[in-house]
Swiss-Prot record:
The gene is UAM2. The record marks 145, 152 as: Required for activity. Its main location: Golgi. GO terms for biological process: cell wall organization; plant-type cell wall organization or biogenesis; UDP-L-arabinose metabolic process. Heteromers with UAM1 and UAM3. It comes from Oryza sativa subsp. japonica (Rice). Is not reversibly glycosylated in vitro by UDP-glucose, UDP-xylose and UDP-galactose. GO terms for molecular function: UDP-arabinopyranose mutase activity. Keywords: Cell wall biogenesis/degradation, Glycoprotein, Golgi apparatus. This is Probable inactive UDP-arabinopyranose mutase 2. Transmembrane segments: none annotated. Probable inactive UDP-L-arabinose mutase. Inactive in vitro, but associates with UAM1 and UAM3. InterPro entries: RGP, RGP_fam. Coiled coil: none annotated.
């Protein structure tokens, strides 16, 4: 059931939160140069972007976002990458944070994160029964004894969640306590996230089938004091939970593991002691049980149907508990309209 993915079907979307992207693009040149690239500049950043030549890319700025008209969606900070998802016209999107460089595997070879994401998306996922030997479609692996033959064809993978080395992706309090701790373990594995299992998807290093999953790849949940660092945000985690619920309902797959990227230390030393209380802790204590118990109805047969139903449930069940959930539901509803008017077209 493996698919073929052409280079012309892929957009690489980069959210530019820093003005000088020279080091980033030069490091990724061997892997990015054959693809079309969308760079979305944080609308709050005044400085001009510095991008080396030799890439097939288009830069989108605050003025481009203004074309959408009045909208409740905030595309600032890390959320600016979602504008890239909206304006892309390719079937697949790969997005990597601008403070990440190519990683090296256990043999010292530089990892082609783009190629690995494409491999994850074009080979089937196996969400309905866990294969204890990781991804059975990777070279050197297979289905284990006892794995039902009726399930071995798998289903299409819609979301590929990559990982990272070096600077860890912690919540603020953990970042303070473990300021000097680094991710150093490279695990050479890919696995399908089982049906019904939830996980915190990170926007640091991710790829997805935009043609199918685009309507649910939105920036909806924003914390009251959201900043420009990953530890300030939950937009990607909320987005990932929504996407996973939709994939489970429509019998699509989600993978996690390879590829790795190398996160820089640029934000690791920031003073975080002032963050005595992070709203995200309390939010996640509400969010996770909600998504774990959520079952979309059998009448939702498309991603758009699922998003509409999910939006209604969020508004009804979570909205009265906290204003940020009500605003998230509004943003999800708004994204549906924007997708129909600006995002639904394909190349």
């Amino acid at each position: 059931m493996s698919l073929e993915i052409q280079d012309s079907e892929v957009d690489i979307v980069i959210a530019a939160l820093q003005p000088n992207l020279t080091t980033f693009f030069e490091a990724w040149r061997p892997f990015f140069s054959r693809f079309h690239i969308i760079v979305v500049k944080d609308p709050d950043m005044a400085e001009e972007l510095q991008i080396p030549t030799g890439f097939d890319l288009k830069v989108y700025t605050k003025s481009d976002m203004g074309v959408l008209g009045a909208t409740s969606i905030d595309f600032s900070g890390h959320s600016c990458r979602y504008f890239g998802y909206l304006v892309s016209r390719k079937k697949y999107v790969i997005s990597i944070d601008d403070n990440c460089l190519p990683a090296k595997d256990n043999g010292g070879l530089t990892v082609d994160a783009v190629a690995q994401h494409m491999s994850n998306l074009k080979t089937p996922a196996t969400p309905f029964f866990f294969n204890t030997l990781y991804d059975p479609f990777r070279k050197g692996a297979d289905f284990v004894r006892g794995y039902p033959f009726s399930l071995r064809e798998g289903v299409e993978c819609m979301l590929s969640c990559g990982l990272w080395l070096h600077n860890a992706d912690y919540d603020p309090m953990t970042h303070v306590v473990k300021r000097n701790q680094r991710n150093t373990t490279y695990v050479d594995a890919v696995m399908t996230v089982p049906l019904g299992a939830m996980m915190p998807v990170s926007g640091i290093n991710v790829a997805f089938n935009r043609e199918v999953l685009g309507p649910v790849m939105f920036p909806a949940l924003r914390l009251r004091k959201e900043g420009k660092h990953r530890w300030d945000t939950l937009e990607d985690v909320w987005n990932g939970l929504c996407a996973k619920v939709v994939c489970d309902r429509l019998r699509y797959g989600v993978k996690t593991g390879l590829p790795y990227v190398m996160r820089s230390d640029a934000e690791a030393g920031k003073a975080l002691e002032s963050l005595k209380e992070w709203e995200g802790v309390k939010v996640m204590d509400v969010v996770l049980p909600f998504f774990e118990s959520l079952k979309l109805s059998s009448t939702s047969v498309t991603v758009e149907d699922c998003v509409k139903e999910l939006t209604s449930i969020v508004k009804e069940k979570l909205g009265p508990q906290n204003a940020i959930f009500a605003k998230a539901a509004d943003a999800m509803e708004e994204w549906t309209k924007l997708w129909k008017s600006h995002g639904a077209q394909s190349a």
